[in-house]
Amino acid sequence: ELSILDALLRKQILAIALDVEHFLKVGLMAEISQNDAEDGYALVQHFFAKYPRIPQELRAKAHNSYCNDLVTKMDAEGYAVWNAIEVLSFGQFIQLYKLYSAENGRWNNRICNLLIPAKSIRNAAAHNNCILNSLQTPYSTPKPNMTRQIESFVSRVPELKKSKSRKTKLA
């Protein structure tokens, strides 16, 4: 039945999206920790200055989320990047990731151009939207056709590199 297939697809998409989000956060933290010019605080100050609505959104999150203690504490003391990535939404994190990448010569079109579509499908899966039903719906924004690039990127993820079933999961 279509609804069962759709539920299974959403479950897989969400699992993959959470892994991608985690991998991006770990990768960004690794790059920042190796960058002697970055202390972890200046980046967040610059990010908040460029996107002034984000600190306001985080303050609002302090009143109705699981991360209220961290948001309240960091709002008073000042955010370091390792604190900020724990409370930013995926969309906000994408903005931070792109900002750091662009300003530190780490811009990668293959990754950065896929972040918004990845966020969109992640949100659709997380909000239990019917995904199979919309596969043929024409969208005004062009969809990326980067199958080889995605496969190459995924093949470099250590946890998936060792997996014998990676090829079948990508097929």
What do the predicted segments below correspond to?
Residues E1-L114, L132, K169:
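Short, contiguous, well-structured surface segments enriched in hydrophobic/aromatic residues
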Residues Y51, P55, C67, N128, ...:
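Intrinsically disordered, low-complexity regions
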Residues E1, Y139-A171:
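C-terminal, helix-dominated tail/subdomain
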Residues C112-S134:
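Histidine-centered, metal-coordinating catalytic motifs and their short helical/loop contexts
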Residues G91, T137-P138:
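A generic structural micro-environment signature
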Residues I32, P138-Y139:
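Single-residue recognition of alpha-helix boundary sites
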